[in-house]
């Protein structure tokens, strides 16, 4: 991804890394179990109480990124919570979500998009109410891994910036920031090393919609991308993964590696990194599949 920049303390940024894997045109479901992390079959639906679906957004986004999925789930009778993700640091973001989950009654299906996948992985640990984890174009770290490390694991992300993070991100100081930490904003305009916000993150949405998403983005800190993940909840909680084959941010090949390592049930869909906006029906189907087991 990036080579290290002297100005920013030698730490690279690749908030979500990816190449387009132009494979399946239709949605294809595949169950995958990693060796050493194989889980029992979770195919038989439960008949218990309907779970609450908790949706966690990723970097450069807010809770509104889930709006279409929320409407579909509510129409199907699900209670849905969409708490804010502070985007301040993996440990603190996960602790914030873990505390929030204790306010939810009954079984939970916990869903994370992109960086939100790393957050749910840590936040759900030890919470017996969380019956299923769902990863949407998401990071699925194991203990000791960082988002930055996983983003760089496969080549081809549109966030690579030709090895210079300054081609992709604006580094902005903020009050009380630890030494070497910055708020990171994805640049909106393209340059020779970066296709611009809309074509990178939202390449299957109308350019005007991508422009709005870029203008309204929320920053994530550099530290959030470099902090190491703790013990993963997916070792004890069944998981599902939706991989957009048009994702230019987090390479589908790397998403598959992470999904298989976690023993997740994998579904491919023809969508960009923002599949919950461009293919909300496909995303909702995967969430409801998990909910059928979790209920």
Mark where each language-model region is.
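Catalytic active-site module of serine/aspartate enzymes centered on a nucleophile-bearing elbow/loop
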Residues: 264-295
